[in-house]
Amino acid sequence: MALTLMKGSEAIAEAAIRAGARFFFGYPITPQTEIPEYMSARMPEIGGCFLQAESEVAAINMVYGAAGTGARVITSSSSLGVSLKQEGISYCAGAMVPAVIINVMRGGPGLGNIQASQGDYFQGVKGGGNGDYHLLTFAPASVQEAIDLMMIAYDKAEKYRIPVLFLADGIIAQMMEPVELPEMVDYKVDPEKKPWACTGWKPGDDPAKRGVINSIYIDTESLAIHNDELQAMYKEVVANEQMWESYNCENADYIITAFGTVARVAKSAIAQLKEQGINVGLVRPITVWPFPYDAVREACTQPSVKAVLDVELNEGQMLEDVKLAINGAKPVDFFGHCGSQMPSTDEIVAKILSMKEGK
């Protein structure tokens, strides 16, 4: 298939359409505004629905309603906009409504800036809204990977009835890369495969099949039972849906852990260090929830590994999960920046050399 040069945000939007999304609800905010801009033109072309909501809060509740019918629905925002969506995201998780949410992360906290960041890891992975819930959370490192993950996102969301979150950063959204676009999925809502969906109820129909979707359980025992069902589902996701990349890890002297675009910078640093005779590997979680604890532990606790370096475009958020995985078996150091200053290849090389010298 031919390659097409596309901006990341537009490629993500097109991939969602090709995966069967026919409803987009959102609100403009930099650096993801190209997603709703693209959808505003593309959705009408394929008979879909684009609606610019009056706010992020309204947009996520529109997602809740439309996804409750069994349709494939998507919304996107950036950081503080996703913060505004958290109540509705918790509703979707609590009601087990599958949907796709894109967070093109920007600098923070507060208004921050409009440059790239990975500062929303805690929000995405640990649960930004209220209650005990998780989102299946992807952290793509390239435009092509974002496309490929989008093509499986709805299938995973519907299999488990779980919202899917993309933790992308402003670099992926704004960069242009050659990509291979998949064929269009012929998706139609099948009530037999989605008996939970609200597909309409008329007088005379069986009341038991009218389909009520909600996340409120006034009776304490009912809420406890529902939460037990959620936790059982999350265990299935943890068991079956972990994704990661191991790069040059066998017999490595040092292991770098990183996610998203930072991992690409880390690979450049690994190449430079190899020229200096230092063997460095990389473990890159592709799903940050569920986090691939076993894979990280296996790579980082090899006898050859002297220490682990976690590199992020924040002040050390995934670092906590890396430390949990390693559990004190190896020293773990951190290098990162806030303020949207991407760690450079030279900085990562210098940090590894410093660790080698025991500094």
Predicted regions and their residues:
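Glycine-/acidic-rich phosphate or pyrophosphate-binding loops and their flanking alpha/beta elements
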Residues: 7-11, 232-254, 267
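Conformationally flexible catalytic loops at phosphate/diphosphate-handling active centers
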Residues: 161-246
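Generic long, charged, amphipathic alpha-helical segments
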Residues: 266-299
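Thiamine diphosphate
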Residues: 1-127, 134, 142, 338, ...
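Short beta-strand segments
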Residues: 100-105, 138-140, 165-169, 312, ...
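Peripheral docking tails and interdomain loops at the edges
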Residues: 312-359
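Conserved thiamine diphosphate
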Residues: 115-170
